[in-house]
Amino acid sequence: MAKNRRDRNSWGGFSEKTYEWSSEEEEPVKKAGPVQVLIVKDDHSFELDETALNRILLSEAVRDKEVVAVSVAGAFRKGKSFLMDFMLRYMYNQESVDWVGDYNEPLTGFSWRGGSERETTGIQIWSEVFLINKPDGKKVAVLLMDTQGTFDSQSTLRDSATVFALSTMISSIQVYNLSQNVQEDDLQHLQLFTEYGRLAMEETFLKPFQSLIFLVRDWSFPYEFSYGADGGAKFLEKRLKVSGNQHEELQNVRKHIHSCFTNISCFLLPHPGLKVATNPNFDGKLKEIDDEFIKNLKILIPWLLSPESLDIKEINGNKITCRGLVEYFKAYIKIYQGEELPHPKSMLQATAEANNLAAVATAKDTYNKKMEEICGGDKPFLAPNDLQSKHLQLKEESVKLFRGVKKMGGEEFSRRYLQQLESEIDELYIQYIKHNDSKNIFHAARTPATLFVVIFITYVIAGVTGFIGLDIIASLCNMIMGLTLITLCTWAYIRYSGEYRELGAVIDQVAAALWDQGSTNEALYKLYSAAATHRHLYHQAFPTPKSESTEQSEKKKM
């Protein structure tokens, strides 16, 4: 399928090219670009593209790095994607003083355009996760998210609330993009979208969200409050102030917002100019944007994205990695699958689930890595007893690691995830046993060796008993020897041809019982179990003639 793409140049801009992409297998070779991870369908249902999300956040370079998720949300057609593209320029050129780029360079990255109809749908993330060194030397992963605008003509209230709420739940820095002023309905919508957070806070006694930044675009009153963060702080203090003469509803809105976010700030940005607002062919060139806007833009973007300003994503006091963020994405989207907005408290349940799943994934990954070091692909064969001892030791360490992680939901809620962890570790252990056994040169010869031993023993017994006149026992041994020889030939044919693999597995099971335990009872029990499980193999190998089966059924009726 043909699709237009733009290659990034040294300024963070793009030159447009056309590529032919016919399948998802070719996606990894694409240049960095926006990837839609939350899809809003025509029936207003939501779908998470887990494949795309995993490809971006679970890449080896970033999956174990603590993540900073920056999101821009707000009403549609207010310049969110336009702003995101300046963020991209900064992230690609932050070492440069003049990071905004060439004044004749079109602005590209996240899809945007002028006009009155919506452009972005669902949630898009930039396919390249940026690795940034914070002032303390820690390297963090920075993820940029662009969201569908709220309250467009094609979206329901549920659509708008879901996208805004989900982006707020996932992000560590939420930019609330507003036009001209912070009006009362803007605050009420924010209250609606973060209602989940208020209820979650009542359960955990922690503020559910981190940083909220009111970005007021097209600010027209610099004589009252100056452009920038200082003027924004004074303006926001006045706008969110709770006073005794306010109506209770207005007080509740402001108290609610303060109770949901750890940090709240504001930035006032001037209008970009009439050329931007009225030119249908405006493509983002800086030369067409007012100097006052560019001046404040150069302050805003570093204020948001400089290393010292980055807030690592935290949930319940725990710093989240890219791997953990994937689990939260999956858990949160589940609560939005129904036809109506879920009860806000379900966000706490989803958070607790994701929290526990992330702990399970971390503990399981720890077990997996250490077992790979012990008996991985390039390691020699390990004695089964030693392997079991290492397994029990590492399993105990993984369980201890799981229990040591701070998790929401309480001990009772976490118990089933502990059981899930133990079950998954035991399944991994079985795989490691099989992998380890495959390295044993004698393991491959176990079945034929066992059958040869049976043939030899029955041959000797048949000869001795025949010599002393015990013909019945000799005949029985000869019969067993013949059946064993047929079994050996059958096993060899199965190994050669690859047919009747289930029958081959039955033969291996019986031979393993004789080899490992040396117990006739164990062998007979396994033979009986295998026969009961795979009866259809007998009927497939020795089909009953139709006439004979008909006669038998008629006799039964009589």
UniProtKB/Swiss-Prot annotation:
Enzyme class, spelled out: hydrolase
Residues annotated for Mg(2+) binding in this entry: S81
Sequence segments annotated as region (Autoinhibitory domain): 521-558
InterPro entries, sorted: G_GB1_RHD3_dom (IPR030386), Guanylate-bd_C_sf (IPR036543), Guanylate-bd_N (IPR015894), P-loop_NTPase (IPR027417)
Record-listed N6-acetyllysine modification sites: K395
Keyword annotations of the record: Acetylation, Cell projection, Coiled coil, Endoplasmic reticulum, Golgi apparatus, GTP-binding, Hydrolase, Magnesium, Membrane, Metal-binding, Nucleotide-binding, Phosphoprotein, Transmembrane, Transmembrane helix
Molecular function via GO: GTP binding; GTPase-dependent fusogenic activity; identical protein binding
Reaction equations catalysed: GTP + H2O = GDP + phosphate + H(+)
GO biological process, one term: axonogenesis
Record PTM text: Phosphorylated. Phosphorylation, by different kinases, of the N-terminal hypervariable region (HVR) regulates the ATL1-mediated membrane tethering step.
Subcellular location per the Swiss-Prot or TrEMBL entry: Endoplasmic reticulum membrane; Golgi apparatus membrane; Cell projection, Axon
The EC number(s) this enzyme carries: 3.6.5.-
Linker as annotated region, ranges: 439-447
Top-level division of the source organism's lineage: Eukaryota
Phosphoserine modification, residue list: S10, S22, S23
Membrane topology, Cytoplasmic segments: 1-449, 493-558
Residue numbers binding GDP: R77, K78, G79, K80, S81, F82, Q148, R217, D218, V276, N279
Coiled-coil intervals: 412-439
Residue ranges constituting the GB1/RHD3-type G domain according to the UniProt record: 64-309
Positions in the Lumenal compartment: 471
Region (Disordered): 1-27
Record region (N-terminal hypervariable region (HVR)): 1-34
UniProt topology in membrane: Multi-pass membrane protein
Assembly behavior: Monomeric and homodimeric. The homodimer, transiently formed by two molecules on opposing membranes, is the active form mediating ER membrane fusion. Interacts with REEP1, REEP5, RTN3 and RTN4 (via the transmembrane region); these proteins are involved in endoplasmic reticulum tubular network organization. Interacts with ZFYVE27; both proteins are involved in endoplasmic reticulum tubular network organization. Interacts with ARL6IP1; both proteins are involved in endoplasmic reticulum tubular network organization.
Its biological purpose: Atlastin-1 (ATL1) is a membrane-anchored GTPase that mediates the GTP-dependent fusion of endoplasmic reticulum (ER) membranes, maintaining the continuous ER network. It facilitates the formation of three-way junctions where ER tubules intersect. Two atlastin-1 on neighboring ER tubules bind GTP and form loose homodimers through the GB1/RHD3-type G domains and 3HB regions. Upon GTP hydrolysis, the 3HB regions tighten, pulling the membranes together to drive their fusion. After fusion, the homodimer disassembles upon release of inorganic phosphate (Pi).
Name of the protein described by the UniProt record: Atlastin-1
Taxonomic lineage from the root: Eukaryota, Metazoa, Chordata, Craniata, Vertebrata
Gene that this polypeptide is encoded by: ATL1
